[in-house]
């Protein structure tokens, strides 16, 4: 999936996560995580984000994640919404999910 534009998903409410994405000129993934629960769940947050990016074959992006204690399912939903917005597609290809 090609990320074409800047995008933001969600708010900074308690129990939620705000994610910002921007395209890069390289194939790197620049991931910055700021979380109120980073000491306990930072690695799990990072693993979830990288797994979703890998599933949609996303490379060459900068991600800024401001987590306020979001559950894993919320993190995934926000990230998938963000990817759709940033790639300019109306909806993700749900029929391709396994």
Swiss-Prot record:
Q: Which residues cross the membrane?
A: none
| Keywords (A to Z) from UniProt | Cytoplasm, Phosphoprotein
Keyword rRNA-binding part of the UniProt annotation:
no
Question: Which InterPro entries does the UniProt record give?
Answer: CitD (IPR006495), Mal_deCO2ase/Cit_lyase_ACP (IPR023439)
Q: Which domain of life is it from?
A: Bacteria
GO CC, sorted alphabetically, is: cytoplasm
**Intracellular or extracellular location(s):** Cytoplasm
In the record, O-(phosphoribosyl dephospho-coenzyme A)serine modifications are located at: 14
Does the keyword field hold Nucleus?
no
On assembly, the entry states:
Oligomer with a subunit composition of (alpha,beta,gamma)6.
The family note in this entry says: Belongs to the CitD family.
What is the role of the protein in this entry?
Covalent carrier of the coenzyme of citrate lyase.
Q: What protein name applies here?
A: Citrate lyase acyl carrier protein 1
Gene source species: Salmonella paratyphi A (strain ATCC 9150 / SARB42)
């Amino acid at each position: 999936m090609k990320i074409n534009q800047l995008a933001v998903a969600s708010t900074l409410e308690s129990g939620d996560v705000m994610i910002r994405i921007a395209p890069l000129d390289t194939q790197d993934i620049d991931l910055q995580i700021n979380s109120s629960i980073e000491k306990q769940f930072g690695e799990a947050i990072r693993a979830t984000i990288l797994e979703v990016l890998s599933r949609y074959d996303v490379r060459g992006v900068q991600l800024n994640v401001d987590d306020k204690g979001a559950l894993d399912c919320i993190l995934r939903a926000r990230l998938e919404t963000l990817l759709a917005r940033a790639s300019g597609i109306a909806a993700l290809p749900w029929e391709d999910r396994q």
